[in-house]
Amino acid sequence: MKTKIIVIVGPTAVGKTALAIEVAKRFNGEVVSGDSQQVYRGLDIGTAKASPEEQAAVPHHLIDVREITESYSAFDFVSEAKMTIEDIHSRGKLAIIAGGTGLYIQSLLEGYHLGGETPHEEILAYRASLEPYSDEELAHLVEQAGLEIPQFNRRRAMRALEIAHFGQDLENQEILYEPLIICLDDERSQLYERINHRVDLMFEAGLLDEAKWLFDHSPNVQAAKGIGYKELFPYFRGEQTFEEARESLKQATRRFAKRQLTWFRNRMQVTFYQIGESGVQDRILSQIEEFLDD
């Protein structure tokens, strides 16, 4: 029997953390961060980590598990998330994955093999090469490869082609979880307002000092490449004014949110909820209750 988990995804600033905490309180759960930047110690404001008070109210995992000089990959996330979910489940609690790093979460849910003899970078590159193909073209590739897919869908076809390409045994790519995937969204102009407001609040909370610390200590590490930091580096180098850098950060974050939504819409089987609609949280909680009781 697969382990039931709740997955909360969506663009930045849409309210994933707040909902995850509410779900955890309601259903005796713990939150597992699905964010590639929140793993780094010292990067708190720019990554929008749950506050110390929020983390005290509900256990959070995969936050502050790396130094800024260390790398972190989808393979690392999948390995550590699996162990964390198993621990949470063994204690009779519900695991709630919440975050916006679509690649990490998709890799966890769909049982992608990111280790072994084939470097995971090669697997991810091959997967990306299949994205431009239409469903009809993918079906043709599946037929050419001599593969059989009982009920064709895009994700299943891509996964079968990936496994055939790398010579991996399909039966070894075990899908461990039965997820309910909730994707939060908002009307575009409202979402962009939320993003702009969040960036302003981050600066009020000390983002500039946090980014300057990263710039002074480790400007070329993986952690520094995340949105929220690298956009401010031109200001520190004297190449932009502060206002230009702040607007650059807002623009980059808006574009990132658009890419996130595209990923969740096209690559994952999600249930969308518009956060601006009346009673949306109650409807989400009701769906979760039905899912867990089924």
From Swiss-Prot:
Domain of life: Bacteria
Lineage: Bacteria, Bacillati, Bacillota, Bacilli, Lactobacillales
Coiled-coil zones: none
Function statement: Catalyzes the transfer of a dimethylallyl group onto the adenine at position 37 in tRNAs that read codons beginning with uridine, leading to the formation of N6-(dimethylallyl)adenosine (i(6)A).
Residues the record marks as site: Interaction with substrate tRNA: T101, R127
Record key words, sorted: ATP-binding, Magnesium, Nucleotide-binding, Transferase, tRNA processing
Name of the gene encoding the protein in the UniProt record: miaA
Top EC class, one word: transferase
Entry protein name: tRNA dimethylallyltransferase
Binding-site list for ATP: G10, P11, T12, A13, V14, G15, K16, T17
